[in-house]
From Swiss-Prot:
Entry-linked PANTHER family: LATERAL SIGNALING TARGET PROTEIN 2 HOMOLOG
InterPro entries the record matches: FYVE_LST2 (IPR043269), LST-2 (IPR051118), Znf_FYVE (IPR000306), Znf_FYVE-rel (IPR017455), Znf_FYVE_PHD (IPR011011), Znf_RING/FYVE/PHD (IPR013083)
Protein name: Lateral signaling target protein 2 homolog
Binding site residues for Zn(2+) 1: 1105, 1108, 1129, 1132
């Protein structure tokens, strides 16, 4: 395309074209080519541009495309030069009247370059000529009037500047010397103001149409992210994750650590900041908007971490070290001292929890999540013997099956407990002590890492963990449950006989259903990191999982085998660690709650999706059969569990209705009637705060290998019958009161029978996966691990508040009960399930439960957080560099006042000559640790300097060193960075004197002053110096200090060589031999010791290549020559050559001139 540039010439009124041409002809010779004044430079640049435009108009570009392309490139370069000089003139003439260009902060960094003005001019001329931007015809049409105004205004400015060149030019004048009273100067001033305003408007519109420009809202969001980075850095400095030295030295590792830590801080600590994922997506910065869903999942998992785990994750993100499971276990073991495996009080539980505040979840501090894994052992109901004294909390004498509740995820246990747990014996209730969260996590680690629980299904001596009769039951509301003890005894007996007959008929069906339910195993974790990609790291259960995290049938059988083979001592030790903080309420009440939580939970998921389901519809509690193992050696359990006739009828009919849980009510025909809840009722923990604190269940296991336990297994049927009668009396009372309180715990056997009855009822109706086995099956039981997610809240209200809350919630449950198809409800927490906070807790628990161990969870979070943070380095590199540069400036240590040096003798003269050297103002290191160059303390260069310089990393970690004086702030920074690169030492070189002269001059040379300055040397130099010193020490000659630098002539093309050490010698006492020895030493060491490399020219002082004068751009980067220190483009410095004189034995980058020079040498 041929670009036609119309140059309109306008003249002042009264000036004819002939006179102007004559003036040009007269003054043309006065502009010398070397004139550096602004007007002279503008005149030559404008004249060259006019010539190129004329040549372009003289031929058809389509006929000669190569020539046209070459001339267009020259045209754009000429436009850049003209506009650059025009900007300098406007800066001098307009000053503060220039148009504001604050909008440039919204531009991408790659747009802001020196050729931007020329591109804008070229685009304005194309638009004014009728062209359009590709695929942006609408924007082009809107910009065309403004483009025409810009080109017209620019031509007016060019004409008036040419006129001023002929009128008021002063050769080599650093400033403009225009006649202020002249009308032409005033017109020029106004023309420049108009052009500046129009050009700024066109710049904003044109760049916005070509590239994506940040809006005002996005810019403010990035400012908030910058503040988040700064707050994160300050927090990391306080917690010891980072060091102030790293900030002061601009450690490049912080460019990765700060964004990673900021993601955690924004999601967990500063929740209302820019990373608040609860706000709409439009209010989130575009930096994190693509990762919104992933960040939400990461936030949920981070809230489930304890403070210790969170600190370990942050440390891992800073150091990139491997996750050590032993360190986690050490933290867990420390928490063991706070929990007592024996008996304790509720106050001890609360104190134990407060003691480990550091292990609390980082989410809500007052609401914790407990994952309970229950091992159920079900056996045939061959009841023998009579257990005397079975009046306390329900144990194996009245329990229908043995349940071992294991806290498998230590998210938190309930605090503020006032009662004791319901783990009881035949003698009475027992009070369990607090079990700290570290202990729970310890159990969880063993359960998940070893693939089997650390307990056994064998029996143990219950007296070891019973506390006797010191627990007083808490009687809440129902005081009439002890009435009507003998009223329905005969009905219960009849029901028992009928149910035992029915169990034999349903045994085969139950086994088949259970095996079918165990075919689909539970997923215990997510993906293996090496076998997945970034997108599915936190994927939910809907996607297929990696096989190594899925529990197979073999693992399930191994799990049951290890459960059956563990010793009783291990079981007792684990039971002590299982019992969590005791909450208010008696044992019977808690047992009833736990049975309902474990049995009445969401049993309609045979595939056990609870561990990975992250959807909001996730129920807050699910019971999933994870393993099953026949156990023929288990002793028969109590067979005094009543089963109802409607239950038998329903199980015979084979109804396939899928239900959440069945509900128990009392009918008019002396037996209980069960119905199916058609509503998808979410089963949560109790609504009562007191009962919700009683989360961790009881331990009831049996085995015929323990005689003591077997005697208790054969409990008295009569006591069970009475407890059932009490349970019915309690239900009648609740039915007449129009609300459904918990049965009173004044009699623990009542709750035992009630639980047994409900358990039997529930197991018959949970036919979806039938984790219950009929009590009538012959000596063959099933051991199943049941993972139950429950939630518990801290009990912060007093008794009356809890009572009032319970009354209201039970009233709501009663209203729901009358509207539903069920006759009654066993879990009065349906109204509370709608609470969003409870659902969130359950979601977090389910999210964490899908990981095998804490190590796996931390590793997954590390990969995701590091992936998001590192992706920002690619997608928003320029914005991230700007923000990190601001963070470094804000958080760097204030500059310390320079201490005046205290030199003496020749040292003072040498150092003074060095410190006064102008080249010491700048010092640049050839190291990858240069994030922000040191000269930015005095210069406002762009952040691209460090990017261009970062490529010049010396493979041998060579460094450029300057003076050793402490007064330079650059030297202080260099010494901070010198941990892995340099060693700042004063090298003492031992040199042997000539033969015959070394012994005589030895004493004087030891006491003599230094002949050269002390300087810092790199590692390679230090090795050479030490080797040279050892070699010369064998000669027995005298010693003296010598500088590591050679003479002045050895530096070649170096522009900053210090004074020669020979010339700086003093007459402090050495005589002629001493002086001659110095000369000899300098020549000897010159061959072995490397010279000082030349100082690099600062990037901001080299806008163009020093060889071809090409301007540097983001694509034409700066490269320093290691031999001369000059700045060149990649074409002019594409050669490499070893430089032994500088200690560089490997090939390094050199410019072409130095390459020719070195090869010639």
């Amino acid at each position: 395309m041929v670009t036609t540039i119309v140059i309109a010439c306008t003249f002042r009124a009264g000036t004819t074209h002939h006179s102007w041409c004559a003036a040009v002809a007269l003054r043309a010779g006065s502009f010398a080519a070397d004139d550096k004044s602004l007007l002279a430079r503008f005149y030559h640049a404008d004249r060259a541009l006019t010539a190129i435009a004329s040549e372009l108009d003289s031929f058809d570009g389509r006929a000669e495309p190569v020539r046209c392309t070459r001339l267009v490139s020259r045209l754009r370069q000429g436009q850049d030069r003209v506009l650059a000089i025009t900007n300098q003139i406007m800066d001098e003439l307009l000053g503060d009247d220039r148009a504001q260009r604050a909008f440039r902060v919204k531009f991408p960094e790659e747009v802001l370059q020196e050729s931007l003005a020329g591109q804008l001019w070229f685009g304005a001329e194309c638009l004014a000529a009728g062209s359009s931007i590709l695929n942006r015809e609408a924007e082009s049409a809107k910009m065309r009037p403004l483009a025409k105004a810009v080109t017209k205004s620019l031509e007016i400015v060019r004409n008036r500047l040419r006129e001023q060149c002929l009128r008021n030019n002063t050769p080599n004048s650093p400033t403009l010397r225009l006649d202020i009273n002249d009308a032409a100067t005033e017109q020029l001033y106004e023309s420049l103001k108009i052009f500046d305003r129009l050009f700024a408007e066109f710049e904003l519109v044109y760049v916005s149409a070509m590239v994506q420009v940040k809006t005002k809202q996005e810019y403010e969001m990035q400012e908030l992210i910058c503040v988040l980075f700064s707050e994160t850095l300050q927090r990391a400095l306080k917690t010891g994750l980072l060091e102030q030295e790293q900030v002061d030295s601009y450690d490049p590792a912080l460019m990765f650590s700060i964004p990673r830590l900021a993601i955690i801080a924004g999601l967990v600590i500063f929740r209302e900041g820019p990373l608040n994922m609860d706000q709409p997506a439009d209010n989130i910065s575009e930096m994190f908007r693509p990762f919104r869903k992933l960040l939400i999942k990461m936030r949920d998992l981070l809230h489930a971490l304890t403070k210790q785990e969170l600190y370990q994750l942050e440390k891992l993100l800073c150091t990139n070290e491997e996750i050590s499971a032993s360190e986690q276990l050490i933290c867990d073991e420390k928490g063991r001292s706070g929990g007592d495996g024996g008996s304790g009080s509720g106050g001890t539980a609360a104190a134990g929890v407060k003691e480990f505040d550091a292990l609390e979840p980082v989410g809500e501090s007052q609401e914790h999540v407990v994952i309970v894994t229950t091992v159920t052992t079900t056996n045939a109901p061959n009841v023998v013997g009579d257990g005397p004294g079975a009046t306390g909390c329900t144990d194996a004498t009245s329990g229908a099956d043995g349940r071992l509740h294991i806290v498998s995820q230590g998210y938190g246990v309930s605090t503020g407990a006032t009662g004791s747990s319901g783990f009881g014996s035949g003698r009475g209730g027992c009070s369990s002590s607090s079990t700290s969260r570290p202990k729970q996590r310890h159990n969880q680690a063993h359960l998940r890492q070893r693939g089997a629980p650390r307990h056994s299904s064998q029996s143990f001596a219950p007296e070891a963990s019973y506390a006797g009769d010191d627990r007083e039951p808490v009687v809440e509301e129902d005081n009439n449950n002890h009435l009507r003890k003998e009223i329905e005894e005969e009905d219960v007996d009849d029901d028992m006989e009928e149910e035992e007959e029915d169990e034999e008929e349903d045994e085969v069906d139950d086994d088949a259903m259970l095996k079918d339910g165990l075919v689909t195993t539970d997923c215990a974790s997510g993906y293996l990191i090496p076998n997945t990609n970034f997108g599915n790291l936190l994927q939910t259960n809907e996607a297929p999982l990696t096989d190594s995290f899925i529990a197979t049938d073999d693992e399930l059988r191994l799990l049951g085998a290890e459960t059956a083979s563990s010793p009783p001592a291990m079981t007792q030790a684990n039971i002590d660690s299982i019992l969590a903080a005791s909450a208010a309420g008696s044992g019977g009440q808690q047992q009833q709650q736990q049975q309902q939580q474990l049995i009445d939970s969401d049993s309609g998921h045979g595939t056990a999706n609870h561990s990975t389901d992250m959807s909001p519809e996730l129920e807050t509690e699910r019971t999933v059969v994870a393993a099953g193992q026949p156990n023929a050696n288990d002793a028969p359990l109590d067979g005094s569990v009543s089963k109802q006739q409607p239950v038998r009828d329903r199980s015979r009919s084979g109804s396939s209705t899928v239900h959440k849980h069945a509900e128990i009510s009392e009918s008019s025909s002396d037996y209980e009637e069960a119905d199916v809840d058609d509503e998808p009722d979410d089963v949560d923990a109790d609504d009562d705060d007191e009962e919700e604190d009683d989360v961790v269940g009881e331990v009831e296991e049996q085995n015929d290998s323990e005689p003591t336990f077997n005697r208790k297994v054969g409990g008295a049927p009569k006591e069970a019958f009475r407890s059932q009668l009490r349970c019915k009396a309690a239900r009648n009372h609740r039915k007449s009161s129009h609300h459904r309180p918990r049965p009173s715990t004044s009699s623990s056997s009542s709750s035992a029978a009630y639980r047994n009855k409900s358990q039997s009822h529930q197991h018959h109706h949970h036919h979806h996966h039938h984790h219950h086995h009929s009590y009538a099956e012959s000596a063959e039981g099933t051991s199943s691990v049941v993972s139950t997610i429950t939630t518990s809240n801290n009990s912060t209200s007093n008794g009356s508040t809890r009572h009032h809350s319970r009354m209201q919630q039970q009233h709501q449950q009663h209203q729901q009960q009358r509207n539903s198809s069920s006759s009654c409800d066993t879990s009065p927490t349906q109204s509370e399930c709608s609470d969003a906070q409870e659902v969130a807790l359950a979601i977090r628990a389910a999210g964490r439960n899908k990981f095998k161990s804490t190590e796996n969870l931390l590793h997954r979070l590390f990969v995701c957080i590091a992936g998001v943070a590192d992706q920002l380095q690619t997608n928003f590199a320029a914005d991230l560099r700007k923000m990190l540069r601001s963070v470094f400036i804000m958080n760097s240590s204030p500059p310390e006042p320079d201490e005046p040096p205290e030199p003496s003798g020749s040292e003072e003269e040498s150092k003074d000559s060095q410190h006064n050297h102008p080249s010491d103002l700048f010092e640049f290191r050839a190291s990858e640790q240069d994030v922000i160059t040191a000269d930015q303390q005095n210069h406002s260069g762009g952040s691209s300097q460090s990017i261009y310089s970062a490529e010049e990393a010396n493979p041998e970690q060579d460094s450029v060193f300057g003076s050793s004086g402490d007064s330079s702030p650059v030297r202080r920074t260099a010494s901070v960075e010198s941990r892995n690169v340099t060693v700042n030492v004063s090298v003492s070189v031992v040199a042997s004197s000539p033969v015959g002269a070394g012994g005589a001059g030895g004493g004087g040379m030891v006491g003599g002053s230094r002949t050269g300055q002390e300087r810092s040397v790199s590692l390679s130099e230090a090795c050479i110096v030490v080797e040279g010193g050892k070699a010369s020490a064998g000669g027995g000659g005298g010693t003296r200090r010598h500088s590591a630098s050679g003479s002045k002539n050895d530096y070649g093309r170096s522009r900053s060589s210090p004074s020669s050490p020979v010339n700086s010698n003093t007459g402090g006492g050495g005589g002629g031999n001493h002086h001659s020895s110095a000369h000899h030493t300098a020549h000897e060491q010159q061959r072995r010791m490397p010279e000082e490399p030349p100082r690099w020219i600062p990037d901001c002082d080299a806008p163009r290549c020093m060889a071809c004068a090409s301007a540097f751009t983001p694509f034409r980067r700066r490269h320093h020559c290691r031999n001369c220190g000059g700045v060149f483009c990649g074409v002019c410095s594409n050669l490499s050559k070893p430089l032994p004189k500088y200690g560089l034995t490997k090939a390094v980058r050199v410019c072409r001139d130095c390459y020719i020079h070195e090869v010639g040498v």
